[in-house]
């Protein structure tokens, strides 16, 4: 089914609701280009749904410009900007028309996929011959500071609530269905000046077959960031598919956290066992899809998990529950915050075991179960294991208790010889302690080449000693008596 936002997007500035000053500024700007006068690029800044992109496309249509657009769904790194935008900024289109370049949501440029994108945009803007319109929700991001100096900034405010009902009536007329004026005003008041959101809400109610004021009142308020409590109220109270799925659209919580909130508050709202069982059944199915998302890294399954946990639980009840219900945060978050220190101790112990057993911490947990049994039954063996795994006394107390840990460390202390550390006595005046002469270290056998050198030196010394001896003790003269 085609989205009505695209189907009924204004084709001309005259069809755009409100923004009269902005429209006139755009007309003056584009006519300067048509007359050959180069102008600075324009940056349209405003909240989502205020009509920034619509204004850019409408002015292009009015003045017969071809549009080249890069939005948040496109890869917008340095190379892409240079190849696509850089080329289009200085040349005509294939049809011979002038080209209007639209860079949507430039404040969303971030991460590795868009690396160098902002710097390349600034480079392109300085040499652009064709008109360029940029849009942003938050123009005062630090990354856009240099960019702001190279553009003409035009602030686009939210659409006035009074300008929304005529647009909704026009769409209802073209789609061929009747709608109560109270429903239109309720949708407009819930939109918070977001025309796109108002059209989406109208389509949700119309396709769901329910155009009652009561259903329109359950639509989420978009005038500010919606809290998780608002989302809980909508999911638990509504029986409308589209309203339930849109309940978490403006909530700044991940699906895992939202799932915990629903799980915690479901028994508070659903008092009939059949409704409660149905709600948890859909919630468990959403958990399966969330697991597949992370396991397979296939984020296309994300929307199924979201639909099951919101619309699934909302439609599980047979009828709405009246009255006020006090919703609260998941108790698991409180427990996790309380046990943060304990969980960190367990991680440290598992890391030590994993290091010694050359396994992961996940497998080390299985090993730890057996170790605890040994710790509680055999202090002697436990002492050796504690020394091997280098566990501290505090860690042992955490795994067992103080008594068991004390017994094990007593065994460890008994195995090691105690070294008495006495304080040195004062020296007596009459007696002095003899200094202890350290023994000469044993010299190992010298290597073969060194042996030859040592032998040669020893022979030379021996020869010199012999000569010296002969000088001191000369030989006596030999006589015939020595032969007899």
Swiss-Prot record:
ATP binds at residues 46-53. InterPro entries: AAA+_ATPase (IPR003593), ATPase_AAA_core (IPR003959), P-loop_NTPase (IPR027417), Rep_factor-C_lsu (IPR023935), RFC_lid (IPR047854). Residues 419-432, 442-451, 459-478 have a biased composition (Basic and acidic residues). Residues 419-484 are annotated as: Disordered. Keywords: ATP-binding, DNA replication, Nucleotide-binding. Pfam families: AAA, RCF1-5-like_lid. One of its GO terms (molecular function) is DNA clamp loader activity. GO terms for biological process: DNA replication. Heteromultimer composed of small subunits (RfcS) and large subunits (RfcL). Belongs to the activator 1 small subunits family. RfcL subfamily. NCBIfam families: PRK04195.1-5, PRK04195.1-6. Part of the RFC clamp loader complex which loads the PCNA sliding clamp onto DNA. This is Replication factor C large subunit.
């Amino acid at each position: 089914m085609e989205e009505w936002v695209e189907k009924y997007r204004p084709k001309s500035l005259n069809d755009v609701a409100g923004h009269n000053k902005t429209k006139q500024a755009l007309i003056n700007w584009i006519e300067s280009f048509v007359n050959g006068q180069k102008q600075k690029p324009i940056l349209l800044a405003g909240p989502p749904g205020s009509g920034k992109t619509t204004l850019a496309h409408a002015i292009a249509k009015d003045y017969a410009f071809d549009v080249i657009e890069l939005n948040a769904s496109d890869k917008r790194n340095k190379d892409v900007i240079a190849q696509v935008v850089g080329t289009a900024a200085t040349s005509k289109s294939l049809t011979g028309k002038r080209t209007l370049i639209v860079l949507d949501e430039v404040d969303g440029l971030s991460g590795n996929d868009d690396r160098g994108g902002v710097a390349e945009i600034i480079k392109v803007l300085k040499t652009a011959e064709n008109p360029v319109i940029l849009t942003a929700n938050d123009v005062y991001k630090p990354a856009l500071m240099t960019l702001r100096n190279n553009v003409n900034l035009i602030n686009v405010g939210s659409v006035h609530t009074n300008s929304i009902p005529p647009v909704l009536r026009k769409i209802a007329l073209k789609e061929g269905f009747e709608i109560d004026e109270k429903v239109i005003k309720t949708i407009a008041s819930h939109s918070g000046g977001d025309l796109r959101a108002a059209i989406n809400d109208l389509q949700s109610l119309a396709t769901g077959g329910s155009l009652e004021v009561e259903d329109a009142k359950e639509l989420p308020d978009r005038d500010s960031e919606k809290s998780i409590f608002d989302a809980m109220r909508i999911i638990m109270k509504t029986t409308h598919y589209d309203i339930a799925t849109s309940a978490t659209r403006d909530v700044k919580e991940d699906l895992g956290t939202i799932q915990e909130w629903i799980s915690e508050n479901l028994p508070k709202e659903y008092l009939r066992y059949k409704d409660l069982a149905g709600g948890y059944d859909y919630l468990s199915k959403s958990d399966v899809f969330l697991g597949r998302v992370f396991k397979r890294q296939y984020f296309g399954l994300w929307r199924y998990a979201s639909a099951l946990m919101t619309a699934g639980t909302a439609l599980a009840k047979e009828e709405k529950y009246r009255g006020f219900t006090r919703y609260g945060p998941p108790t698991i978050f409180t427990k996790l915050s309380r046990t943060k220190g304990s969980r960190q101790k367990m991680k440290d112990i598992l890391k030590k075991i994993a290091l010694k057993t050359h396994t992961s911490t996940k497998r080390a947990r299985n090993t730890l179960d057996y170790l605890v049994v040994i710790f509680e039954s055999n202090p002697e063996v436990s002492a050796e294991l504690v020394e091997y795994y280098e566990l501290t006394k505090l860690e042992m107390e955490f795994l067992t208790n103080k008594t068991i840990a004390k017994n094990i460390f007593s065994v460890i202390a008994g195995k090691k010889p105690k070294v008495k550390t006495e304080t040195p006595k004062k020296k007596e005046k009459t007696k002095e302690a003899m200094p202890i002469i350290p023994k000469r270290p044993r010299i190992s056998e010298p290597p073969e080449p060194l042996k030859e050198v040592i032998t040669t030196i020893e022979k030379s010394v021996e020869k010199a000693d012999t000569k010296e001896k002969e000088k001191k003790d000369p030989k006596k003269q030999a006589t015939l008596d020595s032969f007899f």
